[in-house]
Amino acid sequence: MARTKQTARKSTGAKAPRKQLASKAARKSAPATGGIKKPHR
């Protein structure tokens, strides 16, 4: 379940990078995105 959720989230973010999705993705993998520093702080 966790793997599916992560994959789905990453897939959605890559397909349609939205502000909300990007924020959630950045929070889970801030180093991977390395783009938004606000959610991490």
Curated annotation (Swiss-Prot):
Residues 1-41 are annotated as: Disordered. Coiled coil: none annotated. InterPro entries: Histone-fold, Histone_H3/CENP-A. One of its GO terms (cellular component) is nucleus. SUPFAM superfamilies: Histone-fold (SSF47113). GO terms for molecular function: DNA binding; protein heterodimerization activity; structural constituent of chromatin. Gene3D superfamilies: Histone, subunit A. The nucleosome is a histone octamer containing two molecules each of H2A, H2B, H3 and H4 assembled in one H3-H4 heterotetramer and two H2A-H2B heterodimers. The octamer wraps approximately 147 bp of DNA. Belongs to the histone H3 family. Core component of nucleosome. Nucleosomes wrap and compact DNA into chromatin, limiting DNA accessibility to the cellular machineries which require DNA as a template. Histones thereby play a central role in transcription regulation, DNA repair, DNA replication and chromosomal stability. DNA accessibility is regulated via a complex set of post-translational modifications of histones, also called histone code, and nucleosome remodeling. This is Histone H3.2.
